[in-house]
Amino acid sequence: MKKIVGILAAAAVLATSVFAADVSAKVKLDGKLLNVDTTKEKDGVSAVSIGHNTDESWNPVLNMAVSGDNYGASVGFYIGKWDYGEDPSKWQGWNHGYGVGLKEWKIWFKPIDVLKFDVGRIDQATNQESIDYDTRLFNYDEWGYRVGFSTNGFTLNVAFHQDHDEFWFSQAANGDAITKGLNVFASYGADFGTILAFVDFNDTFRDIKAAAGYNNQFGDIRLFVDAGIQLDGTKDQESVFGAGFDVGFKYAKDALYFEAYARWFENNFEVLGKEGDPMYLYFKAKFSYKLDPCTLFVYFKDENLMAKKFASTIKAGATGSVGSCNWECYAQIDTGKGANGDKINFAIPVSFSVAF
């Protein structure tokens, strides 16, 4: 590990004399001052823990990026490692639980100003909330190739995407042809706002997602809305039709911030209103107010407001910084716990991070 870091550091120093290089790192620790678990026969109480949240697959420990006028690349170290199957040359999946590994590899280049190619880890999404940056109507985040054309506010991206080290097209002898993800994304921005379209084909064109969206900034208010349909098909069965929409609202002025996001989706209209209907209404909101020593906030999230049991996450606390060190401390209540969904969990989580 030391040898790898040394090589990367030397490469970064050498790179600065040739093109723009950026090396960023982040040290983040998460813990709990108190945890009360009421899901057991007798309430369990524990206190004072610290560690690293390995579930934050989006949070790199170390990121290196280089760029020139018309090209660039980046690679990221994350907590976790690639798992291998019987064939040691094949990466089977990312394991969050142990070690440090290189997960994100990206290269881009522009033969001409309006044309851009991305290879490696690529992603695309409809409008996305900025409370947790993890919720949107449709998206993909995989490995592949993407070509993008941009001019005068118009953007068109076409991408072939699939799992790591997987072929987009394959056909065994005397077998059926199999294709993975094909995505087309277009957007146009002007004074009236930005309109977008998202179409994704997967599983040999049997799984289809299509959406249209709009977003705009009205002074201190940002609004967006998306509506889409999906067709979930298999080789031997009829396709299942679903549809949904999402709405985002954000207000930020001076010390005040409020954001809310809602997403409704029906995955299968054939069972609409029946037992086992997968329809859901996802909702989250956050309010914060900046003071001199810290920022106070209240947070609410429920993954399905239409569920029979009230299962939500409620947070109230503060965030702040001392120099480059950021801290967060809050009380958290999780409802809907236990086998019957009638228990709660109470905790006081803390986190500390320094980015450099």
Positions of predicted regions on the chain:
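Transmembrane beta-strand segments of Gram-negative outer membrane beta-barrel proteins
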Residues: 20-42, 117
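Detector for outer-membrane/organellar transmembrane beta-barrel domains
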Residues: 187-196, 200-308
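Sequence/structural signature of outer-membrane beta-barrel proteins
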Residues: 32-41, 78-92, 122-134, 161-177, ...
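Outer membrane beta-barrel
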Residues: 23-24, 53-166, 182-183, 187-190, ...
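Outer-membrane beta-barrel strand-turn architecture
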Residues: 67-70, 111-113, 150-155, 188-192, ...
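Cleavable N-terminal export/targeting peptides
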Residues: 1-24
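Outer-membrane beta-barrel "beta-signal"
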Residues: 322, 343-356
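Residues that define the transmembrane beta-barrel architecture of outer-membrane proteins
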Residues: 48-60, 98-105, 139-145, 150-152, ...
